[in-house]
Swiss-Prot record:
Organism: Chlamydomonas reinhardtii
Compositional bias segments (type: Polar residues): 1175-1184, 1193-1206
Gene Ontology CC: motile cilium
Biased composition (Low complexity): 88-109, 156-173, 385-397, 951-973, 1014-1035
Subcellular location: Cell projection, Cilium, Flagellum
Family under the similarity heading: Belongs to the CFAP157 family.
Name the UniProt record assigns to this protein: Cilia- and flagella-associated protein 157
Source taxon at top rank: Eukaryota
Major localization listed first in the record, in broad terms: other
Stretch list, region Disordered: 26-52, 79-109, 125-173, 327-405, 936-990, 1011-1072, 1168-1206
Length: 1206
């Protein structure tokens, strides 16, 4: 599970770097793997800080704590820059604008990276506190975690138990990788170590098609291992050193298989973000790849030396060499160093990197157990050790059974541009550049820690082997343990063990027994053959230490001399000379010193073969050291040659690529310059053409301007001559205009005089023509009036008949209703009798049954009763038929009554309209009736004589009140009387006047009816005007006319109100209302119509009068109506003469002339209420005629022409 999370951390970090270089302005391109990921993922959304946090939570508290410290170290410069933004910027301000922009572009990806790390750190700190409490609670049960390097209880138990925090982990791999995580966790922590070691080589990813087959192959391998383990259950867990590891438990084979297979997988592998599981998790899908977990229990501690050797081989081949020892019996974390097995692209990208071990490296604990997380500080734990703290102690106090942890694997040189990330401070205060990124060093540090544990386990296994061989010894010696371990290990594993333990524990090598001498010599030969793995300095140091140990072990006796190209020989001296001084053995790669102390014993005696043993050994040692130096320098030279060749090749390739790039850029620049030159030439040609066009346009405008100036001078000269001509003609025109005005005034005066004469002549002719037309119109109107009278009489008779018939029908209806009531009563009586008879029959039948009458009598009675019932039924049916007939008749009569009632209502409404119209006309006539009173003075006595009432009180010159006397009203007749016009009354009209008024009213009614039914036809006569009506009255009722001869003398009303004849030469009489009514009732007038209650007033002398109404219909005096005037009278006073048509007598003196003059004024044809026509000024305005219509007001239609157009 740790491996899965660390893999996700590494890949996510690379992805973030690529995204930062792609998204931020001026960012670098990142590493090759990041570029490949960016190309594969395209525009896919990148991971957030939560993804990194989820990946780290699955690692455990220890790794999270180390990662937190690393993030703090990475973010420290960013915080310092934020807190002090102005420090260190003077030089930057002095640089140019381009340099500042370039720096800002380079800082953009770093700012994005720091922001992501800060976000992840905050989230991890909050979650670590929560997981700390959960871990303590789980530790209380004692079954939630697995021990460090100890037996895991088997795969099945591990799977059932699960990793700590696995239930809450939501890493970038999701649930699809859960089976593989269970396999790795159940196999033990060493499985995780191998898995991480394999992931170290994730540089060249295989094609995606290999990911699923690899997972299937792993599943088959595990199943096969499970079957083999079950089949070989009796085989011992640890095989002999010479046998293969086929008999190992499934967990061991899983280790080997993972170390081999996963070392060749990349980001596109089963667990990579670009592989099937990663893509499926990103898309929310599940990959149908399941890994079956074997059910065989496996114990990591039961691994044999061969299995441990395979594990170490895998780790060494993955890039680990020359770690620094940290003391005997304690596992340390060596500094990662690239081995020659790595390809060139796996070498450090930063030139001049210090690949040697560092003094600040400390072991990294694998399982922190339940200890609290250390507080992040500015110094790692190893730095605290160098500051004086004791190893294994934290600032808060010591912790038992705990190892110091150190996040010194922080990326010094992250796979990005140089200088983007801060450097990890070293013990000496300077920076140390690393060759691996943060995720790589995370994986390598933990894997190397597990490698140390594997070595310790191998040493323990060697001790067990030595104890089993030497049964007499109580405890295995160190040389026996080492010999057993080296004998069981391979070359590479032995080399690792020797390099890890021997340089720091040479004192333990000095105690090798004689049994280990041959093993040490063989190891020396193996080390000399494995020089390609380690550097020459370490090899020579190890060889010198072995030689010294061999000489010390042999003493004065013969010893074993180990040289580079020598065979094993027996040395004459038994031990080193006595004067051998202490020598310092320096391990160049790890820069650690180890002292070889010469034993304090006497020198060996002299020998003939070796007269000077001490000098010989001293020279021999000096020669060996020189040979070691030669070998070391040769190795360094070869290494430098290789490096130089690689650098040369790299620089040559870079130079070639740069040259090719520069050639391409030069070609592009040349092409762009040629295109720019062609474009500029085209622009220049177009500009020249444009300028030539502008010049031509300016020349054309200049030519036009010159022509315009020439024309302007000619036009100005011509304009001056035209102005002079205009002034002369203006003066002539004014003179002519004055002459024309004078001639016009003279002509206008002449025209006025001529037109005035013509107008007078035309007026006289029109007046004569009008008189002739009025005479004809009057006769036609009289005929129409008679026809209207006949029609009215007929309608009256028909109305009376309808009323009588209606009364009869109403009486019949009442009779039928009475008969209907009687029929209903009869029906009820018959029904009541029928019920009574039925009851009687029932009673009789019951009595007959009781008394036992005979059947014949009963039948007779019943027959009689049935006959009676039949008669009653027939009578009832007849009554019902009669009732239905009467009801039908009543309905018909009711319908006829309703129709007749509607007709009567229509006639009544028509009569009401006629009556209202006539009443209005009578009210108007009442206003127009005047009474002429003549006052005579004889012998100082005065008397008043009233003339008959006249129509038109305003014609006499007086007002309607009759108070003023018009000028000229008095005359010098015989008697010397004055005539006064007073308002008259309708009852003073004579029968002749009433008849004429009634005729005029009928004419008006006929005309109004015609207007209400539509426009007049050509055959319908126009209504009578005042003048026409006066002419008709003068012709029909004047003196000598038939109407006048039929009139009798009527009594006159004197001034004192008495009735009787009126004396005087005029013989005039004024009839009273009672006399007029009596005359109308006596039937003395032929012109009385059959209108029932209507009486006709008559007049004489051509006087226009107004009509009266019947007594039953008259609304009384003062009712408003239509004002109307009558017209002409015959000149002369014959009809008012002394012969007297009415009152008798003869003569017609001056009084008659005065009356004629007054009547002529009243009944004048032209402007009766104003001035005469001759007195009116001439106007050109044409007045339209006025037409009297029903509903118009009477006051604005008062005139002498009535409804005729003037």
């Amino acid at each position: 599970m740790w491996a899965v999370a660390r893999l996700g951390l590494r890949l996510r970090a690379s992805w973030w770097e690529a995204q930062a270089g792609r998204l931020m302005p001026g960012g670098g391109g990142g590493s090759a793997a990041a570029a490949a990921m960016q190309e594969e993922q395209g525009e896919q959304e990148g991971p957030t800080g939560r993804d990194l946090s989820n990946a780290l939570y699955a690692l455990g508290e220890g790794v999270v704590a180390n990662t937190l410290w690393a993030l703090q170290q990475l973010l420290a410069p960013a915080r310092a820059e934020q807190e002090h933004p102005q420090e260190g910027r003077p030089q930057q301000q002095e640089q140019g604008g381009e340099a500042r922009q370039e720096q800002q572009g380079q800082q953009a990806p770093r700012q994005l990276w720091w922001a992501l790390l800060e976000r992840s750190r905050q989230h991890m700190e909050a979650t670590c506190v929560q997981q700390q409490g959960q871990g303590r609670g789980q530790a209380a049960d004692g079954k939630s975690t697995s021990s460090r390097g100890a037996a895991g209880g088997g795969v099945a138990k591990a799977v059932a138990r699960g990793p700590r925090g696995a239930g809450t982990a939501r890493g970038p791999l999701g649930t699809a990788a859960a089976p593989l995580r269970r396999v790795l966790w159940g196999a033990g922590r060493q499985d995780v170590c191998v898995y991480l070691s394999g992931l170290r080589r994730l540089h060249m990813p295989p094609p995606p098609s290999l990911a699923v087959p690899l997972m299937q192959r792993l599943e088959q391998q595990l199943l096969a291992a499970e079957g083999e383990a079950q089949a070989e259950a009796a085989v011992p867990a640890r095989a002999p050193p010479s046998t293969a590891s086929t008999a190992a438990p499934p967990s061991a084979r899983c280790l080997v298989y993972l170390a081999v297979e996963l070392s060749h997988m990349g980001p596109l592998g089963p667990l990579g973000p670009l592989g099937p599981l990663g893509k499926a998790q990103a898309g929310g899908q599940q990959v149908p790849v399941q890994v079956q977990v074997p059910g065989v229990e496996a114990d990591v501690g039961s691994l044999g030396a061969r299995e441990c050797a395979d594990l170490c081989v895998a780790l060494v081949r993955l890039g680990v060499s020359l770690p620094r020892g940290a003391g005997s019996g304690k596992a340390t974390m060596p500094h990662p160093h690239p081995s020659p097995h790595l390809r060139y692209d796996e070498q450090p990208q930063l030139s001049g990197a210090d690949l040697g071990p560092s003094a600040d490296m400390a072991p990294l604990p694998l399982d922190t157990g339940e200890r609290a997380l250390p507080e992040p500080s500015s110094h790692p734990p190893v730095a605290r050790q160098q500051l004086g703290e004791q190893p294994g102690e934290q600032p808060g106090g010591p912790h038992e059974d705990e190892e110091d942890w150190d996040p010194a694997f922080v990326a010094d040189g992250y796979e990005a541009e140089a200088g983007e990330l801060p450097k990890r401070p070293s013990a000496s205060g300077g920076g140390m550049e690393g060759s691996f990124s943060l995720p790589q060093q995370l994986a390598l540090a933990q894997s190397l820690h597990w490698l140390d544990q594997a070595a310790a386990h191998m040493m323990q296994t060697g001790a067990e082997d030595a104890a089993s061989v030497d049964e007499e010894a109580e405890a295995p010696e160190a040389d026996a343990v080492l010999a057993a371990a080296l004998a069981a290990a391979r070359d590479d594993t032995a080399l690792y063990l020797f390099c890890s333990w021997a340089p720091s524990s040479l004192s333990s090598l000095s105690s090798l027994s004689a049994t280990a001498t041959a093993t040490a010599a063989a190891l020396r030969l193996r080390l000399t053959g494995a020089a390609h793995v380690v550097e020459g300095a370490a090899l020579q140091a190890a060889a010198a230490a072995l030689d010294a140990a061999c000489w010390k072990q042999q003493g004065a006796g013969p010893g074993v001399v180990v040289g580079k190209d020598r065979e094993v020989q027996a040395a004459a001296p038994a031990g080193p000379p006595g004067d051998l001084e202490a020598e310092q053995v320096v391990c160049a790669p790890c820069m650690c010193t180890g002292s070889i102390d010469t034993p304090d014993q006497p020198p060996a005696p002299n020998n003939l073969n070796n007269p000077h043993p001490s000098a010989f050994h001293r020279y021999q040692d000096h020669g060996d050291r020189l040979q070691v130096d030669v070998v070391r320098l040769t190795d360094e030279l070869e290494t430098q040659k290789l490096n130089l060749r690689d650098i040369n090749e790299f620089l040559t390739n870079e130079l070639k690529s740069k040259v090719a790039e520069l050639n391409g850029l030069m070609d592009e620049v040349k092409k762009s310059h040629e295109a720019s030159l062609a474009r500029l030439r085209g622009d220049k040609d177009r500009e020249l053409e444009r300028l030539e066009g502008v010049v031509r346009e300016h020349e054309r405008k200049a030519r036009i301007t010159q022509e315009f100036l020439d024309k302007k001078e000619a036009l100005e000269a011509e304009m001056q001559s035209l102005k002079e001509t205009l002034a002369r003609k203006t003066k002539d025109f004014e003179q002519q205009l004055t002459d024309i005005d004078r001639q016009h005034i003279q002509d206008r005066e002449k025209w006025k005089r001529e037109m005035a004469g013509r107008i007078k002549e035309t007026k006289l002719q029109m007046m004569k023509l009008t008189d002739n037309q009025l005479e004809m119109t009057t006769k036609r109107t009289i005929m129409e009036n008679e026809q209207m009278s006949i029609e009215l009489s007929y309608q009256s008779r028909q109305t009376e008949k309808l009323l009588n018939k209606n009364n009869k029908l109403m009486e019949e209806n009442a009779e039928l209703r009475r008969q209907l009531e009687l029929s209903k009563q009869t029906e009820e009586e018959l029904a009541r009798r029928n019920n009574l008879y039925q009851k009687t029959i029932k009673t009789l039948l019951s009595k007959l049954q009781d008394q036992g009458y005979q059947a014949a009598e009963s039948e007779e009675v019943l027959g009689a009763l049935d006959g009676r019932l039949g008669d009653l039924a027939a009578h009832l049916h007849l009554a019902q038929l009669q009732l239905e007939e009467k009801s039908a008749e009543a309905d018909a009569l009711r319908e006829r009554l309703e129709s007749k009632t509607a007709e009567a209502a229509a006639l009544t409404s028509g009569y009401d309209d006629t009556a209202r119209f006539l009443l209005a006309c009578m009210a108007d006539v009442r206003d127009k009736v005047v009474t002429v009173v003549r006052t005579t003075t004889t012998n100082n006595t005065s008397s008043d004589e009233r003339l008959p009432p006249l129509a038109g009180a305003d014609a006499a010159g007086g007002s309607r009140s009759g108070s003023p006397t018009p000028p000229g009203a008095s005359s010098s007749a015989a008697g010397g009387g004055d005539i006064t016009v007073l308002p008259g009354r309708l009852d003073e009209l004579s029968p002749e006047q009433r008849e004429r008024v009634l005729g005029w009213l009928l004419e008006r009614l006929h005309y109004a009816t015609g207007l209400s039914h539509g426009p007049l036809s050509q055959s319908s006569p126009a209504p009578l005007s005042a003048g026409g009506m006066g002419s008709a009255l003068a012709g029909e009722w004047g003196p000598g006319s038939p109407g006048g001869s039929r009139l009798g003398r009527l009594p006159t009303r004197e001034q004192d109100g008495s009735a009787g004849g009126m004396g005087g030469p005029q013989g005039l009489g004024a009839t009273s209302g009672a006399a007029a009514a009596a005359a109308g009732a006596g039937g003395g007038l032929d012109g009385v119509s059959s209108l029932g209650g209507l009486g006709y007033g008559l007049g004489y002398g051509g006087v226009g009068v107004s009509s009266s109404v019947m007594a039953g219909m008259s609304p009384g005096p003062g009712v408003p109506g239509y004002s109307v005037s009558t017209g002409d009278v015959m000149p002369g006073g014959g009809m008012l003469g002394g012969a007297g048509v009415i009152g008798g007598g003869t003569g017609g003196g001056a009084g008659g002339a005065v009356v004629d003059e007054a009547l002529a004024k009243v009944l004048s044809e032209v402007r009766p209420w104003g001035k005469r026509s001759e007195q009116q000024p001439l106007t050109t305005t044409k007045h339209s005629g006025t037409f009297l219509r029903k509903g118009n007001g009477p006051s604005n239609n008062t005139g002498s022409r009535g409804s005729l157009k003037v």
